[in-house]
Amino acid sequence: MAQVQYYGTGRRKSSVARVRLVPGEGRIVVNNREISEHIPSPALIEDIKQPLTLTETAGTYDVLVNVHGGGLSGQAGAIRHGIARALLEADPEYRATLKRAGLLTRDARMKERKKYGLKGARRAPQFSKR
C-alpha cells in the first residue's frame, strides 16, 4: 500500500515552499540536502521547526521540502508556513494551536518598491540648504 503523505504550500516574501510530511524519524530535507547545509543559521532552523515543536510532532514526521525564490529568511518563513499547513492536513485538531501561534497566516509584508526621484523606497537625496 502507498505511504501516507501530507502536503502543504508555504509562501513568504518572494519564496515558495512545497512541503511533504512523511511518517519518519524527524529528518528535514530541503532541496535534496540536509537542512543545516541549505540554511546555515541555527536561529532560522529553530524558526522552521516551530510548528513541529508546538504540535509535539518533532520526531514523528520526515519533512521533505522543495523551495525556490527569495533569500534565506524568506525561504525559512515559507518552509515554516508550509509545514504548518501540512500538519493541519495531517490532523485538523492542530488548527487552534497553530492559529494561536500565528503560523497559518501568510505574512503579507513585501519589499516596498523604489520610487523615481528617490534613492530607495523612501530615502530622499541629500538636501542642501545652500
Curated annotation (Swiss-Prot):
GO terms for cellular component: cytosolic small ribosomal subunit. One of its GO terms (biological process) is translation. The keyword Ribosomal protein applies. It comes from the Bacteria. GO terms for molecular function: RNA binding; structural constituent of ribosome. Gene3D superfamilies: 3.30.230.10. Keywords: Ribonucleoprotein, Ribosomal protein. InterPro entries: Ribosomal_Su5_D2-typ_SF (IPR020568), Ribosomal_uS9 (IPR000754), Ribosomal_uS9_bac/plastid (IPR023035), Ribosomal_uS9_CS (IPR020574), Ribsml_uS5_D2-typ_fold_subgr (IPR014721). Signal peptide: none annotated. Belongs to the universal ribosomal protein uS9 family. This is Small ribosomal subunit protein uS9.
